[in-house]
C-alpha cells in the first residue's frame, strides 16, 4: 500500500503538471472554444478528485468522476469544428490537419478512462493506479501533439 501511495503522489504531480494551461485564463473565449476549455478544466478537476479519492478508496465517487471524464472524451472531437482554432484557443492546427489522429487520441483517452471505471468497480487499487497513470499519460501525449 505504501508503494501505491508513492505512485499515486507521483501521478498527481504529473497530472497537475500535464495540464497547467487548462487553468490559465482564456480571455475572450466564447462559444464552442469556451465550452471545450471549460470541459478540459473540468477534466483536470475530476482527475485531481480521483487522485484524492484513491487515498480513501472511495470507489463509487471515483466511478462518478471517471464517467464524467469519459463522457467528455467521447464527445471531445465534436468541440473542434473546422475554423475553431486561433487565439484564444491553444489548439494547434494539427488537430484539423490530422483530425483522424485527433479522434484516435480522444478515443485512447476514453479507453484509458474506462480502465479507471472498471478497476474502481472491481475495487482493485493496483489496476486503478495503472489506469489512472494511463489516463494522465493520454492527456500529456495528446497535448504534446495537438496543443500549443
Name each model feature, range by range.
Residues 26-134:
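Extracytoplasmic c-type cytochrome modules immediately beyond a signal peptide or single-pass transmembrane anchor
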Residues 15-23:
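C-terminal segment of classical bacterial N-terminal signal peptides
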Residues 19, 133-136:
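Processing junctions and N-termini across compartments
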Residues 3-4, 14, 67:
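Hydrophobic residues within membrane-embedded alpha helices
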Residues 1-9:
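Bacterial N-terminal signal peptides that target proteins for export
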Residues 135-147:
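The canonical Cys-X-X-Cys-His
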Amino acid at each position: 500500500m505504501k508503494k501505491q501511495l508513492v505512485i499515486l503522489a507521483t501521478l498527481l504531480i504529473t497530472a497537475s503538471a500535464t495540464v497547467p494551461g487548462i487553468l490559465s485564463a482564456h480571455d475572450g473565449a466564447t462559444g464552442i472554444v469556451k465550452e471545450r476549455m471549460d470541459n478540459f478544466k473540468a477534466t483536470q478537476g475530476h482527475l485531481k478528485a480521483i487522485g484524492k479519492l484513491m487515498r480513501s478508496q472511495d470507489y463509487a465517487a471515483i466511478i462518478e468522476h471517471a464517467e464524467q471524464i469519459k463522457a467528455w472524451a467521447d464527445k471531445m472531437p465534436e468541440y473542434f469544428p473546422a475554423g475553431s482554432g486561433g487565439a484564444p484557443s491553444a489548439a494547434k492546427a494539427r488537430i484539423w490537419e490530422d483530425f483522424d489522429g485527433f479522434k484516435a487520441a480522444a478515443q485512447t483517452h476514453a479507453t484509458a478512462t474506462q480502465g479507471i471505471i472498471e478497476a474502481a468497480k472491481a475495487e482493485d487499487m493496483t489496476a486503478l493506479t495503472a489506469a489512472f497513470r494511463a489516463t494522465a499519460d493520454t492527456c500529456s501525449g495528446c497535448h504534446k501533439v495537438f496543443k500549443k
